[in-house]
């Protein structure tokens, strides 16, 4: 799948131009073999997958213009000129396989980060550290690096930090903190659809489930592990980007034994994409369970539930019944087995699939206009569909007469009097589809609730291992309310992430005896405020319009513009300004289209229908809305989708903030789902959306360069070779002397207890000083090198003289003979 022009524009906007090219010595001559990255090249024009090329700077360059020759990917060999503003520093002579932390690179500009990740990815090193993150790139093939042997390798290592980056290393670290400090942990796994979040979560679960002694009771662990196929069946779907896309957020709490193995657990699901239940884009599917059920059900189930073919159901896209690499029949059998392993009995399992059949059947019921009670557009059920409607209600264990009444009859209370009218066709259709969505969502949550009742510890969790599986920032061509909710979630997580990084930096400074006054960072509090602050924010004005008579999407946008235009994080749109608006998110500006915002935010099942469900004679169905407060008639503040989302998100963040977090960022390397294929624009967009570039920027705060004394001496020994080789000085004294000789100002450096701290410009100046020293020695080195070569050659000849003379003697002897 080719890169779109929109993606290319987005990717190029992300690139930060911060490199100060230090290609010249004191006399203005180009350093020999000096390499840079540039985004100017015929290769880039021809191949949209490439954003940068590596070049060598040639003589004839100056401070404004550089003459360069492209070397990677190989070019024509012909020099060409570029503006110095189109050049970035390069990490020359760095082996990406020799270390796994991007933050240790001298240069962490955009092309350097992309190149580092690419080299590792192409050599099947899919895990890289960008402290405190682990970056995981989807290999689209089995690398054999998540086997039981690999689990033992990371679990049993005396020091796992010496092993290469891996999600098992993250799991080991979190587990060590959980048991060593008795503090709850959370592993946050995020990434876009198809990036490998689900697989990463599975493998971490597998690590936690591994036991050293194998003696623990596996009853609860089996139930927890069995939940994965069920959660995927009900919460995952085929999208354009991913055949197994998770369309909900998941937070798990696990109690893990000191010896390994999961003792207890709990699952919270949120942000389920309900719109997918009733409609899907071309080449996409609804949730897997529908297709698994229709294909995998035996003849008895098909007869009992009146099942038809996939193309016979209006709620299912008829164009994508099958998916490459997915066996729906086999997966259905796995779901049945998993439901049983979750301790659901046969009757409960039958009710689950009866409800699913009922949802599909209700979707086929046509709502039409009829003339009733003097109204020409009154809603009615098509005469030919009455039996279908009754069958749907029967399958969902609901009274058809009561449901019919609530779908068609509109009741209002005026002055204490009850007035009955009729819903119009559109209103009744919305109510019907809301019932379909509500039944599915509540069924999904009931399955999870039932699981939790069997696996949660008595008395609750003391210290737990949390796992959050969540999408990263979403930026589409058309961004709606779903994207707004997802991006609000990510802003909350971003605040948590920045606070953690800042806290860790502050601790390092304190431990090394360095003042934290140099640490300054930008908070995203203003963005969060403009999005969801009580009373004056995007969500509060949306709720106002949902509750106001005559509220509309346009009035909502206008209210935002009038009240928020002075806030720099809210930007009125220039095109279609009556329905579009822009939020200046952490990752950049995102434009939202307000079409159907009010409709989606009011997508709450009416209290009268909820009451019918609660009154069902079936225990499973009556339990779907158990505990929910019924509000009949008018909607109230707090009952809307946005309010429910914020309450749930606030609770989730409170829980996460009480833990020690660990971060795994999953990257999708290409849209073709092929191994060893690298698409730079798409990857860069993800690096930005997942705050990976932001993490590297945060590492640059204050004294961004930090190395142990020995590491510093190894890197900069040629600044003053006499000092670095002076055996009478200890490592700290050597570092101190080299820094004084370099002439760096005091505000550029600090020497801690075990480390050297330098500001970014200070590290660059030191690198330049070392290059100039090496240039000064170049002629001397060449003479010494030639003398050594001559000596070695002479010594080699002398060592072989006797042998050569013997060979000559043998040859002469044969010639004489």
From Swiss-Prot:
Keyword Nucleotide-binding set for record: yes
Protein's cellular compartments: Cell membrane
Region ranges (Tail): 773-817
PROSITE patterns reported in the protein's UniProt record: MYOSIN_MOTOR
Residue intervals of the Myosin motor domain: 97-771
Domain notes: This protein differs from the typical myosin heavy chain structure in having head and tail domains but no discernible neck domain.
Protein family per UniProt: Belongs to the TRAFAC class myosin-kinesin ATPase superfamily. Myosin family.
Protein name: Myosin-A
Species the sequence originates in: Plasmodium yoelii yoelii
Taxonomic placement: Eukaryota, Sar, Alveolata, Apicomplexa, Aconoidasida
């Amino acid at each position: 799948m080719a890169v779109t022009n929109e993606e290319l524009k987005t990717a190029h906007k992300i690139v930060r131009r911060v490199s100060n090219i230090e290609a010249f010595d004191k006399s203005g001559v180009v350093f020999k073999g000096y390499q840079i990255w540039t985004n100017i090249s015929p290769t880039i024009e021809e191949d949209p997958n490439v954003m940068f090329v590596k070049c060598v700077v040639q003589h004839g360059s100056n401070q404004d213009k550089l003459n360069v020759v492209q070397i990677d990917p190989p070019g024509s060999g012909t020099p060409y000129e570029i503006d110095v503003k189109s050049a970035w520093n390069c990490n020359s002579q760095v082996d990406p396989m020799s270390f796994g932390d991007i933050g240790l690179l001298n240069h962490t500009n955009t092309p350097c980060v992309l190149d580092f990740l690419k080299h590792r990815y192409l050599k099947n090193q899919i895990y890289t550290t960008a402290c405190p993150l682990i970056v995981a790139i989807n290999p689209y093939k089995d690398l054999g690096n998540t086997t039981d042997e690999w689990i033992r390798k990371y679990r049993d290592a005396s020091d796992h930090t010496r092993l290469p980056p891996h999600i098992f290393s993250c799991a080991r670290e979190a587990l060590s903190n959980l048991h060593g400090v008795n503090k709850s942990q959370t592993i946050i796994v995020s990434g876009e659809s198809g990036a490998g979040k689900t697989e990463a979560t599975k493998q971490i679960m597998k690590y936690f489930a591994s036991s050293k002694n194998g003696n623990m009771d596996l009853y609860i662990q089996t139930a927890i592990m069995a939940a994965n196929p069920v959660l995927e069946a009900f919460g995952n779907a085929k999208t354009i980007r991913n055949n197994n896309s998770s369309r909900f957020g998941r937070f798990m709490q696990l109690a893990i034994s000191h010896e390994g193995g999961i003792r207890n657990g709990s699952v919270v699901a949120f942000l389920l994409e309900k719109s997918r239940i009733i409609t899907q884009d071309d080449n996409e599917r609804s949730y897997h369970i529908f297709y698994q059920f229709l294909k995998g059900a035996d003849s008895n189930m098909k007869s009992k539930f009146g099942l038809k073919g996939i193309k016979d159901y209006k709620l299912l896209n008829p164009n994508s019944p099958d998916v490459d690499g997915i066996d729906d029949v086999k997966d259905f059998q796995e779901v049945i087995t998993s439901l049983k392993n979750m301790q659901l009995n046969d009757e409960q399992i039958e009710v689950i699939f009866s409800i699913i059949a009922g949802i599909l059947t209700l979707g086929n019921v046509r709502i039409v206009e009829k003339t009733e009670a003097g109204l020409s557009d009154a809603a009615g059920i098509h005469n030919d569909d009455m039996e279908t409607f009754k069958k749907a209600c029967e399958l969902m264990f609901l009274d058809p007469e009561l449901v019919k009444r609530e779908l068609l009859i509109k009741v209002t209370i005026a002055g204490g009097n009850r007035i009955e009218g009729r819903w119009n066709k559109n209103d009744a259709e919305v109510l019907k589809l809301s019932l379909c969505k509500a039944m599915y969502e509540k069924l999904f949550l009931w399955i999870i609730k039932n699981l939790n009742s069997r696996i949660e510890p008595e008395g609750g969790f003391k210290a737990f291992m949390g796992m959050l599986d969540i999408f990263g920032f979403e930026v589409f061509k058309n961004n709606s309310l779903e994207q707004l909710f997802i991006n609000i979630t990510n802003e909350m997580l971003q605040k948590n992430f920045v606070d953690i990084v800042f806290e860790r930096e502050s601790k390092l400074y304190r431990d090394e005896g360095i003042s934290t006054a140099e640490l300054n960072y930008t908070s995203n509090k203003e963005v969060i405020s403009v999005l969801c602050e009580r009373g004056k924010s995007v969500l509060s004005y949306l709720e106002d319009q949902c509750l106001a008579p005559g509220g509309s999407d346009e009035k909502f946008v206008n209210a935002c513009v009038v009240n928020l235009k002075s806030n720099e994080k809210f930007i009125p749109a220039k095109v279609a300004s009556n329905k579009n608006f822009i939020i200046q998110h952490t990752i950049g500006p995102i434009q939202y289209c307000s079409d159907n915002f009010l409709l989606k935010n009011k997508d709450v099942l009416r209290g009268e229908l909820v009451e019918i469900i609660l009154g069902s004679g079936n225990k499973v169905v009556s339990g779907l809305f158990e505990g929910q407060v019924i509000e009949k008639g008018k909607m109230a503040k707090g009952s809307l989708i946005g309010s429910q989302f914020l309450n749930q998100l606030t609770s989730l963040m409170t829980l996460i903030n009480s833990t020690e977090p660990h971060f795994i960022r999953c990257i999708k390397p290409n849209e073709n789902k092929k191994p060893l294929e690298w698409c730079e624009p798409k990857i860069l967009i993800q690096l930005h959306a997942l705050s990976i570039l932001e993490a590297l920027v945060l590492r640059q705060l204050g004294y961004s360069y930090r190395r142990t004394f020995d590491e510093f001496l190894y890197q900069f020994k040629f600044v003053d070779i006499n000092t670095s080789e002076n055996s009478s000085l200890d490592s700290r004294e050597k570092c101190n002397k080299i820094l004084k000789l370099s002439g760096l100002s005091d505000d550029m450096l600090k020497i801690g207890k075990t480390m050297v701290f330098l500001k970014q410009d200070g590290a660059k100046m030191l690198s330049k000083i070392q290059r100039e020293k090496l240039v000064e020695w170049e002629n001397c080195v060449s003479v010494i090198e030639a003398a050594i070569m001559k000596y070695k050659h002479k010594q080699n000849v002398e060592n072989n003289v006797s042998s050569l003379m013997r060979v000559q003697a043998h040859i002469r002897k044969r010639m004489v003979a």
